[in-house]
Amino acid sequence: MKESIAKVYRKTGETEIKSEINLYGEGKYDIKTGIGFFDHMLNLMARHGLIDVKLEAKGDLQVDSHHTVEDVGIVLGESFKKALGDKKGIKRYGTSFVPMDEALASVSIDISGRPYIVCDFNFTVDKLGEMDTELVEEFLRALAFNAGITLHARVLYGKNNHHMIEAVFKALGRALREAVDIDERINGVMSTKGTL
């Protein structure tokens, strides 16, 4: 089985985070951010992406969860970029639609080296557990910009905010899994420019 492992450590005045990922894993996870709902979502991303993730974050949660969530996105983005290496043979694009009961979400990504994000969410509550729902977009932005990917995430419809966000994180994992999949027919990288 192919492995693509990356370790990243980041310490600031607000957070301290260490991460180890294997892009071609089995979906094993050991994630501790101090934010229960966020841990649950990251576990889902790892499991459905078949990405092994070990991550421990200590943040200034006495302030709020913003710094921790955003900085976890930064560290995971850096980890993905490092684990991808030269990107030879990867399919580059991934799209997933995931239903969660009454909710439906989609995530499309392009491992292009050109970070960009578009989110279309209409959450109807401010918080789930200790996590502000607006931080879903902050996490995705930090992830995309530090991984060097274009990411479009959308909740097409839904009523239960937990279900909507859960569908987004599952779709993120599945889209990543598709994009990093190796196709032996690809000579070099999937670009006419010869670089990603």
Curated annotation (Swiss-Prot):
PROSITE patterns: IGP_DEHYDRATASE_1 (PS00954), IGP_DEHYDRATASE_2 (PS00955). The keyword ATP-binding does not apply. It catalyses: D-erythro-1-(imidazol-4-yl)glycerol 3-phosphate = 3-(imidazol-4-yl)-2-oxopropyl phosphate + H2O. It is found in: Cytoplasm. SUPFAM superfamilies: Ribosomal protein S5 domain 2-like. Pathway: Amino-acid biosynthesis; L-histidine biosynthesis; L-histidine from 5-phospho-alpha-D-ribose 1-diphosphate: step 6/9. Keywords: Amino-acid biosynthesis, Cytoplasm, Histidine biosynthesis, Lyase. GO terms for cellular component: cytoplasm. Gene3D superfamilies: Imidazole glycerol phosphate dehydratase, domain 1 (3.30.230.40). GO terms for biological process: L-histidine biosynthetic process. One of its GO terms (molecular function) is imidazoleglycerol-phosphate dehydratase activity. PANTHER family: IMIDAZOLEGLYCEROL-PHOSPHATE DEHYDRATASE, IMIDAZOLEGLYCEROL-PHOSPHATE DEHYDRATASE HIS7. This is Imidazoleglycerol-phosphate dehydratase.
